[in-house]
Amino acid sequence: SFTSYQQAREVIDTTGGEYYAEMLANKGITYLGSFHNGFRQLTNSKHAVTTPEDLKGLKIRVPGSAVYMGVFKALGASPTAMSWSEVFTAIQQGTIDGQENGCSVTKSAKMDEIQDYMTIWNYSYENDLFVANTKVWENLEDNTKELLQQCATESCEWGRDRLEAEEDELIKGFQEEGMQVDILTEDQLQAFKEAVAGVTAELKQSYGEEACAAFGIN
């Protein structure tokens, strides 16, 4: 994953965006831009997580995705696929120890009220795409396409800026509420990257070298 929103912007606005455009064009879709959905962070009720060893044995709710399951298994945790609607109660009852999600979702779901520890590690970046049906797009006047492309670009930038500012405020709020928030350093993150190297290798095989190279996955 990217290490920062700045890196995400730089990659997606160059090689990543080019890859999206080519891939979508083959499906009759025109790519107009990309905006953040956010980095996924970790919260739990047990203890601070700053090393892979800290995750060992922790029961963490993840979406039902082989990638997420693989990452947490590689880190020694016990990933649990569970409906999001069940997570709050499961944490209260001790069925699971924590969850991973974006800061805004963590706040809206009131996880900060039942979780004492948060790890900012940017382990997974998610974004949404601004697209158009190519058949419809090609029937538009050139000046209309230019205007819509400009609006799409401006909207994506606005969305990115807003999410980044909102997350900074949310993290400050979590800390002020008494939540321990550990923002991992590059050295700390390196240990996690090494622990999931096998999963990264599998992703390269699954998605192909071209896709991985486009998004800076080496």
Regions found by a protein language model. Give the residues of each.
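N-terminal secretory/targeting leader peptides
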Residues: S1-Q7, G16, L24-N218
